[in-house]
């Protein structure tokens, strides 16, 4: 989630633990409590785009399972208290094809409201929501196929965002007088001119 789009990188305060005790399985869990933006030296609580109230509890846990040398499966769960709960599933596969290789990258996010989101002032997500109440309810999926040959690669991809609300991630831009905006996210479109994360975009 850290964004490095400015001179100074975004930083987070919290803790994380990673385990590789089981063969071919990497487990990760942690908690984030505060963030320091790209344009400030002070830390703030956590929020989403449009949210003006801060949360200090972001939990995450999940794992990467290397099924074989060419196939990796991922699952992660995250919860920003009073804003959202998010499930992520991913699948990556490499296939030797002629003199090159074909990489398949599938990603799916299911995000729903948590706690005060959509119920109390300051805990609403920005942008369109189906009932106009700022409630988070989103499914986003993407598929990308990349053929690589030597030092060259060409990618064909598709991403689709459901119509009930925007895709969400940690973004403190709505916190009053903090200038703490900016976020990166695990989507194929993150480094494009537009991230295409608004409700209904594809």
Feature roles, as predicted:
Residues 13-15, 25, 57-61, 71, ...:
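Hydrophobic, lipid-facing positions within transmembrane beta-strands of outer-membrane proteins
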Residues 1, 24-28, 36, 69-74, ...:
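Repeated loop/turn-to-beta-strand initiation elements of outer-membrane beta-barrel proteins
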Residues 28-58, 111-113, 117-121:
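Short, flexible helix-coil linker/hinge segments at the edges of structured domains or between repeats
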Residues 79, 83, 89-202:
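Outer-membrane beta-barrel pore domains
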Residues 40-49, 55-65, 73, 91-92, ...:
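Outer membrane beta-barrel transmembrane domains
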Residues 1-34:
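Outer-membrane beta-barrel channel domains
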Residues 2-9, 35, 53-55, 78-88, ...:
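Solvent-exposed loop/turn segments connecting transmembrane beta-strands
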Residues 19, 31-33, 65-67, 75-79, ...:
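Short, structured patches in soluble enzyme cores that scaffold and shape functional sites
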């Amino acid at each position: 989630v850290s964004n490095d789009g400015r001179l100074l990188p975004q930083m987070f305060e919290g803790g994380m633990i990673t385990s590789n005790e089981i063969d071919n399985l990497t487990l990760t869990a942690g908690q984030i409590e505060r963030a320091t933006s790209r344009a400030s030296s002070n830390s703030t609580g956590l929020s989403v785009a449009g949210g003006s109230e801060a949360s200090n509890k972001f939990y995450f846990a999940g794992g990467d399972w290397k099924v074989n040398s060419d196939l990796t499966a991922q699952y992660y769960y995250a919860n920003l208290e009073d804003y959202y709960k998010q499930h992520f599933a991913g699948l990556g596969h490499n296939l030797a094809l002629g003199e090159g290789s074909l990489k398949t990258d599938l990603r799916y996010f299911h995000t729903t409201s948590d706690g005060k989101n959509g119920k109390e002032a300051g805990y609403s997500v920005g942008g369109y929501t189906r009932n106009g109440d700022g409630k988070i309810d989103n499914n986003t999926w993407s598929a990308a196929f990349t053929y690589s040959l030597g030092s060259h690669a060409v990618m064909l991809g598709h991403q689709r965002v459901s119509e009930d609300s925007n895709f969400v991630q940690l973004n403190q831009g709505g916190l009053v007088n903090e200038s703490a905006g900016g976020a990166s996210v695990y989507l194929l479109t993150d480094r494009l001119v537009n991230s295409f994360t608004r409700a209904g975009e594809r």
